[in-house]
């Protein structure tokens, strides 16, 4: 492997190895090609980058801290654990990093309407937020199942002026919401910008979303250099579609000394049919415009994903993750619902931080690994979002446990 090989992708066709690409309807192809051209031009435009930096600083509140989790470190008795505090961003998660970038691009392209899909509602909230800030009408597609379990975020989106379209097709979750958003885009190609929330979809989305999220890893590198004078030994992030993970990982892919771990949602266990671990329990296929690992049945039909966290129950994964899995640069593991909940409670009690259930999957893996590692091992966890949105889920789970007891 040459030194830059891992970070070089995608190629001109949007491929990371054999993953990614542009599998879209004929009507969308000109649009997707146009978006790729516009994005390349924007990346090279100092004015665009200057405006992006302004909003990252004054609107999102970056840089956010790299925080030494002293009590969790003591509790584990091994590696020195740091949290990259994405939950301190405006809107409470990493999602807004990408939304600000894409809305500036939409504005540059003269688009008059935003659409987006959302699962946990955090991308919907971030999209509604930037739509309000830039005075654009906004339609959010959200699975009916997710609307039920994310009432607070639904209300936040409405407060911000977004129209929410409930999707009852399929399981009424993120995959179905994305299908509906793609249908809308095909119908309204002229004036509409589709703001995809993760590192999936047709090229250029996986690379573009990664680039807007890569500020996470860039800041982490500089902050750890300042605190410890060196690179981290390991990075851990949860992976649904995988944008917070790609954001943290990307800057370190060519640093061979840095171990990188992505944590999928193991649900009730990857040996059951109730999980969302596409890499640990899926096979390659095509969904939502790109080739990647997917949860499929023997007939190639997409199966339902399950996770206690609404943001991880997607039956696929970003194509760059699929590539990094195949070339073995990143290790992908899974954490069950119960393990994530235990880590959620531990982080609340030990650090006074209420993490999102998504982030709790990464925390659970860290809690497993840290005790076996030396005290000078530097471990960074991406705390991708805050747990306010998950209160009802955790309350329901605790009530169910009490009943069983």
UniProtKB/Swiss-Prot annotation:
Gene3D superfamilies in UniProt: 3.40.50.1100
InterPro entries xref list: Trp_synth_b_CS (IPR006653), Trp_synth_beta (IPR006654), Trp_synth_beta/beta-like (IPR023026), TrpB-like_PALP (IPR001926), TrpB-like_PALP_sf (IPR036052)
Catalytic activity field: (1S,2R)-1-C-(indol-3-yl)glycerol 3-phosphate + L-serine = D-glyceraldehyde 3-phosphate + L-tryptophan + H2O
Cofactor(s) required for function per UniProt: pyridoxal 5'-phosphate
Pathway where it operates: Amino-acid biosynthesis; L-tryptophan biosynthesis; L-tryptophan from chorismate: step 5/5
SUPFAM superfamilies: Tryptophan synthase beta subunit-like PLP-dependent enzymes
PROSITE patterns xrefs: TRP_SYNTHASE_BETA
Keyword entries, A-Z: Amino-acid biosynthesis, Aromatic amino acid biosynthesis, Lyase, Pyridoxal phosphate, Tryptophan biosynthesis
GO CC term (a single one): cytoplasm
Subunit annotation: Tetramer of two alpha and two beta chains.
Family from the record: Belongs to the TrpB family.
Protein name: Tryptophan synthase beta chain
